Amino acid sequence: MSAPSTSTVVRVPFTELQSLLQAIFQRHGCSEAVARVLAHNCASAQRDGAHSHGVFRMPGYVSTLASGWVDGQATPQVSDVAAGYVRVDAAGGFAQPALAAARELLVAKARSAGIAVLAIHNSHHFAALWPDVEPFAEEGLVALSVVNSMTCVVPHGARKPLFGTNPIAFAAPCAEHDPIVFDMATSAMAHGDVQIAARAGQQLPEGMGVDADGQPTTDPKAILEGGALLPFGGHKGSALSMMVELLAAALTGGHFSWEFDWSGHPGAKTPWTGQLIIVINPGKAEGERFAQRSRELVEHMQAVGLTRMPGERRYREREVAEEEGVAVTEQELQGLKELLG
């Protein structure tokens, strides 16, 4: 999770930030429905301290829309495929509106069958992944999602990049506690965090990436300008990244991370790939005991010395934001106003 820049920080009410972001999306070609979904996602990331996926992303969204690479007016096409399977053609638009269009059907299937799969293809995902799964856990369901991105990661033992950062997000209910939620790239670092470090003139820890010659580097600009990221944990992260390619692209009908070509759309930033979401109803197995067992696990992890659960920092940031407003820098706020025009 990245920190905001060193510019003066101001606090903005969440609803005010969300409204501003929605207006920007609509100003640059998104329908009201699409703009509303994207604005909530982006504002939520900023609120929770995930700055690499918050308002930092807005110039990329705008340049992508201007390039014609993504359709901000797309209407997702939902197909009820089987008792536990839903398929969505995002119609060249963003993945989050596709999820929103299929969500009610997906939840109904998961509650009935015990498990349901949502396969999204022909979609663009440029955001944090945890907002896609956390709401399911708030309803007592377990959710897992994977999405592949653009080629920027060298598989372990390989010489050239092939995979995307290929994140995995998971959410589960926990009795008398916030849901257990994590969202992690299978690369050593999120691509957005590399961009933020480059903008700030900061060096990266060792083991994050390589330069254009395949040599290890701590220079984020070298990684972005012809270099590549490494998978986390060597062969283990590489295997998980491969799994994401199979689930998010091969299974859904989406593009692999290397299969699309945006060279004809200068300014395009959003990967045109796929997403898979699996939702499980624990009530079909352990019933209400599952949330209690989740709580038991948390308590035992804390008892052995764990001081921060996955996702806990986000909840703390959220609590502060609810009282004081969402943290944005004056520079970021001015940039948003300029995007609005």
Swiss-Prot record:
Entry binding sites for substrate: R57, T165, H191, G192
Enzyme class: oxidoreductase
Matching Pfam families: Ldh_2 (PF02615)
Cytoplasm keyword on record: no
Activity-pH dependence: Optimum pH is 7.0 for Pyr2C reduction, 8.0 for Pip2C reduction, and 10.0 for L-proline and L-pipecolate oxidation.
Family label: Belongs to the LDH2/MDH2 oxidoreductase family.
Complexes and interactors: Homodimer.
Record's miscellaneous remark: The enzyme reaction proceeds through an ordered Bi-Bi mechanism.
Function, as annotated: Catalyzes the reduction of both Delta(1)-pyrroline-2-carboxylate (Pyr2C) and Delta(1)-piperideine-2-carboxylate (Pip2C) to L-proline and L-pipecolate, respectively, using NADPH as the electron donor. Can use NADH instead of NADPH, although with much less efficiency. Plays an essential role in the catabolism of D-proline and D-lysine, which allows P.putida to grow on each of these amino-acids as a sole carbon source; D-lysine appears to be catabolized only through the pipecolate pathway. Can also catalyze the reverse oxidation reactions, albeit at a much lower rate.
Protein name as it appears in the record: Delta(1)-pyrroline-2-carboxylate/Delta(1)-piperideine-2-carboxylate reductase
